């Protein structure tokens, strides 16, 4: 890292993360293939079609009863108005019995509507949650069948968002959109029919306001979209900056870069403020515009209704019902617009989910697989060629024979292909040409699970999960007893420090295992590998994260562990592999030297150059 204070400060590298949360007014993401994604989703929902049809029927019936309410209520208003007029004229009174019957009938309509609405909501929620449950299960199962190259070409957040963000978005949109479409369309049609039954003239007057409101709303949306996009873009920038600063706060403090960090944040925050203010202001205009246009409609209906009532064409109750219908008429239009956005979100989310489910899988099993009772541990690389891309071969004609129980060290500069060889051995990738044999059988003739059961691994990047230390070590062999776990910890020289921790083996590690040191993490993963007791071991910089004193203790434990087992050790510190039975020196994907430590030093070749360079100072 540069120590030049004049150089512009750069944030620590970004950690993989999923999509940012949706901010207010975020532009709805659209699917690339809306029709295709919708077809796949409909097919996926096939087992629930009977329930979905029931939901549609219940939603329609609920809406019919609800729409009928205002007109029935209008009869009570008319009866009340006529009764008052008769009472004033002295020709009669108010018929409260009739009004009571009308009100009870109206109440019954709304109760029945609510019952059907409750039923359809209950059924639809069940469909949605079952779909999300099944989809998460399918995605999780799919992850276990995916090739390693898929995950290495994507961030963790991108993959995990399929299970979290995309499935949640799909579930929420699915739950709301189906019933909302049926309800809104039924309400729109039913309301229009009721309005026409009361007065075609008043219906025409009320419909004239719709184009006006649409034009005004379209104008506002058109001018606010660019600010919404900018708002969401800079919201993502700010979220990213906050996460990076939090992850690298020690580096920032160490280099006294707090002021530069705050300045960078303020610049992005100012842009976010301006775009958010404009977008929210323009967005806030829509409701006043709708209310203003709606009031114009009410005024038109009131004037025309009053004239028609004077002429005895319609009653006062009809005017009251019609005003209610005008109010209800604009609501489903707004709901349909919202549903259109939900459908776009649902299609986009389902598209990403189905794209993932349609990804190419690796072959988990093979026909007539090799199933040896016991793997001895002989390994042969026979003229192996490999490239992550077909047109870029990085390992060229790699050949080596390893006898059972031998300790093989693989050394070389960064990018020489050391870790790639391990990935090929574990069948995380398949060779482009040539073959890798274990106990004389091509590893492609083994089921992947059977092959990987033969390997124990300790990697440079430690992985521990949230749970107790005992559970983390036992992950190497789930049926191991507590005594076997403790014995493995002792062999890995981890027992002593575990006993000093609060709770000992029952201490709970947090999500990132940040409540133990990096060296302690490595000791725990070594204990896990010892417990697994696999015939073939892979150690990729297994002692790189511990101090020299701890390294010596671990190296002794590993020497005992590797006796009688075939071991592949990838190391940059060449002092740790002096006792290896064979050292393979790699450069640019090829083995350029092979032999023991002393033999290679005597050759005074590339290995000797690497070894001496580590002790020059």
Predicted regions and their residues:
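Membrane-proximal cytosolic tails and large cytosolic loops of membrane proteins
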Residues: 1-35, 89
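ABC-type nucleotide-binding domain
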Residues: 2, 365-366, 372-617
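Short intracellular "coupling" helices and adjacent cytoplasmic loop segments at the cytosolic face
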Residues: 20-29, 129, 137-161, 165-167, ...
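A short amphipathic helical element positioned immediately N-terminal to and/or at the very start
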Residues: 33-49, 159
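Hydrophobic alpha-helical transmembrane segments of ABC transporter permease domains
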Residues: 46, 104, 116, 120, ...
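Transmembrane helix-loop-helix hairpins at lipid-water interfaces of multipass membrane proteins
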Residues: 52-116, 197-201, 312-316
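An intracellular "coupling" helix at the cytosolic face of ABC transporter transmembrane type-1 domains
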Residues: 148-149, 167-174, 178, 186, ...
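Helix-loop-helix
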Residues: 194-208, 278-351, 356-357
